[in-house]
């Protein structure tokens, strides 16, 4: 196999990677990658994954997200998780513990507090 097989494969799966290596990846591309991480991997989403993938610092990606969206990555992730949980509560017969786990929370009381802050109500009226 060619010595650059791994790099070639990474470039094919992530077309922005060569731009990152050349120092030309846009802030918008980083923010889009962060938002994609939230929507596609919200259960275990991490901004560190995006920073590592694009070869930039966590602080830089975080700053890009906040500058472009007006919210922190954590706020955006929580919003997506809460909206997903609310949808699941309305449309499924899963119990609340299953939903809490599926949306990425391990601490039930923390989930309830966030849910109540966001919606001002419990499961029955969600």
List where the protein language model places each region:
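Inter-domain helical "communication" segments and dimerization helices
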Residues: 1-45, 49-60, 67, 71-73, ...
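Append "Primarily bacterial transcriptional regulators
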Residues: 48-57, 61, 65, 99-106, ...
């Amino acid at each position: 196999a060619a010595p650059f097989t791994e790099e070639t494969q990474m470039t094919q799966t992530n077309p922005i990677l060569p731009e990152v290596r050349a120092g030309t990846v846009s802030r918008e591309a980083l923010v889009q990658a962060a938002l994609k991480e939230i929507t596609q991997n919200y259960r275990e989403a991490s901004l560190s994954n995006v920073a590592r993938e694009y070869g930039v610092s966590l602080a830089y990606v975080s700053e890009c997200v906040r500058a472009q969206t007006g919210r922190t990555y954590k706020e955006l992730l929580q919003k997506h998780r809460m909206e997903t949980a609310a949808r699941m509560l309305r449309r499924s017969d899963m119990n609340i513990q299953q939903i809490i786990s599926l949306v990425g929370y391990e601490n039930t009381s923390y989930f309830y507090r966030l849910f109540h802050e966001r919606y001002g109500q419990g499961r029955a009226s969600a």
